């Protein structure tokens, strides 16, 4: 590991106690192999870090769906890393820390808004898919979509019960967001925005039946989209996220913080929009305080004028170029019937990395 990254990582780990105070550290279950077999080891609920009492009760009462919860968080993290692969902050995780994103999510930034939304959406998605696959006895197919068929098709297969997946995500992910402060309000809003995206993208999926693929009759069921579509949608919401301001109100239970759109001339955010109220760091240089790893040695696109281009990604520091040889399949030929044969070629590429 590069010395500057090693020093940063040590800073993040040693400063972890400060980070954990308001952090959903139960996300770390996505990185633990032990949680894939929760159904056969009920005592592991107590070993999941960061669970509040309500989450612990949920885990023990619905132990068989906890592997899906873990899989959903993992799915959300992977999608975050895909969506931000060309950004200065690329959704880096720290395997040896309970705060798996480091201090980055300590602030109420756009990045924090996106991660909460995609993680909550991931939990809803994975639980819904698991139920449709029959891996749990407490859920199954959606029984609501069995009404009159449409023209040329009939109901069949297993419609995915996204309402149940959303309910699980809401009960589990929102359990810790019960404080009367602005950060809890922000997290709950963005969690719900992620889950709403799942419901909004449900669609009919059909299979044709008939002689020679004539599709005389179609069997259809209610299905979730590919999770990539959810990530793409939420990434657009990240780019257009609404900046908020914090307001304090005196209520019977004490002071309560709420959020209000900062700019009254703009359309106020809906339940489908992401919200934030603190500015992001520029992520150009390593900084243990903000959790930034910097962009040194990151691969950049020399032909792009976007954020993944060498000018912006490297923050004006310039870039290095090296050549790299790669083995690739080439001159492929299709043989009847039915296989493809290829030769192996060596191709040379220019690789550009930030200084």
Curated annotation (Swiss-Prot):
Subcellular location, record wording: Secreted, Extracellular space, Extracellular matrix; Secreted
Signal peptide range in chain numbering: 1-21
Gene Ontology terms, MF aspect: cytokine activity; frizzled binding; protein domain specific binding; receptor ligand activity
InterPro entries with a match to the protein in the record: Wnt (IPR005817), Wnt3 (IPR009141), Wnt_C (IPR043158), Wnt_CS (IPR018161)
Glycosylation: residue positions: 90, 301
Processing and modification events after translation: Palmitoleoylation is required for efficient binding to frizzled receptors. Depalmitoleoylation leads to Wnt signaling pathway inhibition.
GO cellular component labels: endocytic vesicle membrane; endoplasmic reticulum lumen; extracellular exosome; extracellular matrix; extracellular region; extracellular space; Golgi lumen; plasma membrane
Lipid modification (O-palmitoleoyl serine), residues: 212
Keyword Disulfide bond: yes
GO BP terms in the entry: anterior/posterior axis specification; axon guidance; canonical Wnt signaling pathway; cell fate commitment; cell morphogenesis; cellular response to retinoic acid; dorsal/ventral axis specification; embryonic forelimb morphogenesis
Domain of life: Eukaryota
Principal subcellular localization: secreted
Pfam families associated with the record: wnt
Family: Belongs to the Wnt family.
PANTHER family, per database record: PROTO-ONCOGENE WNT-3 (PTHR12027:SF82), WNT RELATED (PTHR12027)
Role played: Ligand for members of the frizzled family of seven transmembrane receptors. Functions in the canonical Wnt signaling pathway that results in activation of transcription factors of the TCF/LEF family. Required for normal gastrulation, formation of the primitive streak, and for the formation of the mesoderm during early embryogenesis. Required for normal formation of the apical ectodermal ridge. Required for normal embryonic development, and especially for limb development.
Assembly, per entry: Forms a soluble 1:1 complex with AFM; this prevents oligomerization and is required for prolonged biological activity. The complex with AFM may represent the physiological form in body fluids. Interacts with PORCN. Interacts with WLS.
Name under which the protein is recorded: Proto-oncogene Wnt-3
Organism whose genome encodes this protein: Homo sapiens
Gene assigned in the entry: WNT3
